[in-house]
Curated annotation (Swiss-Prot):
Glycan attachment sites: 58
Highest rank taxon of the organism: Eukaryota
Subunit structure: Homodimer.
Similarity comment: family membership: Belongs to the immunoglobulin superfamily. BTN/MOG family.
Name under which the protein is recorded: Myelin-oligodendrocyte glycoprotein
Signal peptide: 1-27
InterPro entries assigned to the protein according to its UniProt record, in alphabetical order: Ig-like_dom (IPR007110), Ig-like_dom_sf (IPR036179), Ig-like_fold (IPR013783), Ig_sub (IPR003599), Ig_V-set (IPR013106), IgSF_BTN/MOG (IPR050504), Myelin-oligodendrocyte_glycop (IPR016663)
Compartments it resides in: Membrane
GO cellular component: cell surface; external side of plasma membrane
């Protein structure tokens, strides 16, 4: 009986030590959680990519960063309580900021300033605590600030107010013409002194031209403006592709 106890006691102690070691290792583990949906931003605006650890814990002493594929380009890196700007990819230098007001709760966010078309795509956020590291994916969608403008919208914007204005002017013109014909017929001799004699006999095609021409002018101008804006944005995008740094 004493022999059994002498054999079982060391094995029990060994099991307890293993359990303690496992509990310590699991106590330092966590998960990294991203926003779960794409973050959208306009060209030239700012974008914030949030990231947190679960369960929440103080991440001040951890290494926190964002990188992009390919080649794991460093977008932003926080280590030893400081931002490591020297390790950033050249295209992100001076454009990123780590928002760490809630880092004591394990919550941070990456702010990207002056967003470019080339910033669109996937990002990886990671937290590293000594030798343990977890990460999560974050996606950024960059949108054209004039994405809602198209020729159909331009036509609608131009036509509706201008058409209402021109219809109103045309109706007033026809009303005055009819009234002058009926009421001032007897005074036509006097009217000839102040009005063109052809004023009371304006052909329909002239009235139509009078109504349509002012509508087409602003519409053409808006379409030209729309094409210019899109060419400018496309040129900016191509320039970023040629000179990413």
């Amino acid at each position: 009986m004493a022999g059994v106890w002498s054999l079982s006691l060391p094995s029990c102690l060994l099991s307890l030590l293993l359990l303690l070691q496992l509990s310590r290792s699991y106590a330092g583990q966590f998960r990294v959680i991203g926003p779960g949906h794409p973050i959208r931003a306009l060209v030239g605006d700012e974008a914030e990519l949030p990231c947190r650890i679960s369960p929440g814990k103080n991440a001040t002493g951890m290494e926190v960063g964002w990188y992009r594929s390919p080649f794991s380009r460093v977008v932003h890196l926080y280590r030893n309580g400081k931002d490591q700007d020297a390790e950033q990819a050249p295209e992100y230098r001076g454009r990123t900021e780590l928002l760490k007001e809630s880092i004591g709760e394990g919550k941070v966010a990456l702010r990207i300033q002056n967003v470019r078309f080339s910033d669109e795509g996937g990002y990886t956020c990671f937290f590293r605590d000594h030798s343990y590291q977890e990460e999560a994916a974050v996606e950024l969608k960059v949108e054209d600030p004039f994405y809602w403008i198209n020729p159909g919208v331009l036509a609608l914007i131009a036509l509706v107010p201008m058409l209402l204005l021109q219809v109103s002017v045309g109706l007033v013109f026809l009303f005055l013409q009819h009234r002058l014909r009926g009421k001032l017929r007897a005074e036509v001799e006097n009217l000839h002194r102040t009005f063109d004699p052809h004023f009371l006999r304006v052909p329909c095609w002239k009235i139509t031209l009078f109504v349509i021409v002012p509508v087409l002018g602003p519409l053409v101008a808006l379409i030209i403006c729309y094409n210019w804006l899109h060419r400018r944005l496309a040129g900016q995008f191509l320039e970023e592709l040629r000179n990413p740094f």
